[in-house]
Amino acid sequence: MALFSVRKARECWRFIRALHKGPAATLAPQKESGERVFSGIQPTGILHLGNYLGAIESWVNLQEEYDTVIYSIVDLHSITVPQDPTVLQQSILDMTAVLLACGINPEKSILFQQSKVSEHTQLSWILTCMVRLPRLQHLHQWKAKAAKQKHDGTVGLLTYPVLQAADILCYKSTHVPVGEDQVQHMELVQDLARSFNQKYGEFFPLPKSILTSMKKVKSLRDPSSKMSKSDPDKLATVRITDSPEEIVQKFRKAVTDFTSEVTYEPDSRAGVSNMVAIHAAVSGLSVEEVVRSSAGLDTARYKLLVADAVIEKFAPIRKEIEKLKMDKDHLRKVLLVGSAKAKELASPVFEEVKKLVGIL
């Protein structure tokens, strides 16, 4: 699955080089050396179908493409809104189990808990001292999230994107897989790196976005909005841990329209098109192949077909999650080892930052 145009260009160049080397050359995947990928996910809430197709599948693939891949469970970000401490502790372990079950491999990537690496917050403070207040107040996500909180939102929520920038820059990350709703935050990351470099000399690379080719999975109950962990309608979101019976029920109740034919027309038939997009993503088929193979089915039967495809996709993952959650010591060890590896990378970067800023 193509993730961004630069990758396509690299693959073409490798192919050309292989042709010139003669019949002994191979086209085996090669990892990008000297480049670092970073991404993070909040531990709160259960991963849903949209998270999996829009982010986690890409994370798994990136492990095979880059030498250094760093994934963080960003617990500090999660406390920008109120959390129950006991629930949060369990959620961190649960998210670790989910990521491992989905294919995140600690032998191929670094998986760690954000709060265990103090360089994140230390660098965040330095970057906070470089950004103007209006810059943060004009970010779309701040406006949307602050509107949902009492008293206009917290300072932590406002400076969330600066901590996000520190997460990325403290590893000198070169690439960041992001969704469409994070593009504005990536612009802030690049601006902060650029500002730091202009003030203290060239130090941080300007991270590039890796945009997934998977469009946002829509709510099953309202295809005009994206699928969300926090949707109050329990039938709107398919969670990765849902039982087969729950998945069938949710797809059976999914909103489509009064036309029975299965077509892919996102602008005029959002509900059915969402079903087709999900079906294509979990089956590995193209949208066109899915539509052709579904000819003759009405939407009621088609929704059950999509449900079966999702159940088949999630069955081994769900089984592995249940197994991993039984061994909390193993999950804690994964995070402990990952945090040590992450700190080993972040510490020398921040030591250099301190020298440049003059706070050694």
Swiss-Prot record:
The UniProt record lists the EC number as 6.1.1.2
Q: Name one GO molecular function term.
A: tryptophan-tRNA ligase activity
Q: Has keyword Nucleotide-binding?
A: yes
What PROSITE patterns does the entry give?
AA_TRNA_LIGASE_I
> What does it catalyze?
tRNA(Trp) + L-tryptophan + ATP = L-tryptophyl-tRNA(Trp) + AMP + diphosphate + H(+)
Q: Which residues bind ATP?
A: Q42, H48, L49, G50, N51, G179, E180, D181, V217, K226, M227, S228, K229, S230
Boundaries of the annotated transit peptide in chain numbering? 1-18
Give the InterPro entries listed for this entry: aa-tRNA-synth_I_CS, aa-tRNA-synth_Ic, Rossmann-like_a/b/a_fold, Trp-tRNA-ligase, Trp-tRNA-ligase_bac-type, Trp-tRNA_synthetase
Any one GO CC term of this protein is: mitochondrion
Role played:
Catalyzes the attachment of tryptophan to tRNA(Trp) in a two-step reaction: tryptophan is first activated by ATP to form Trp-AMP and then transferred to the acceptor end of tRNA(Trp).
What does the sequence similarity comment in the record state about its family? Belongs to the class-I aminoacyl-tRNA synthetase family.
Record protein name field: Tryptophan--tRNA ligase, mitochondrial
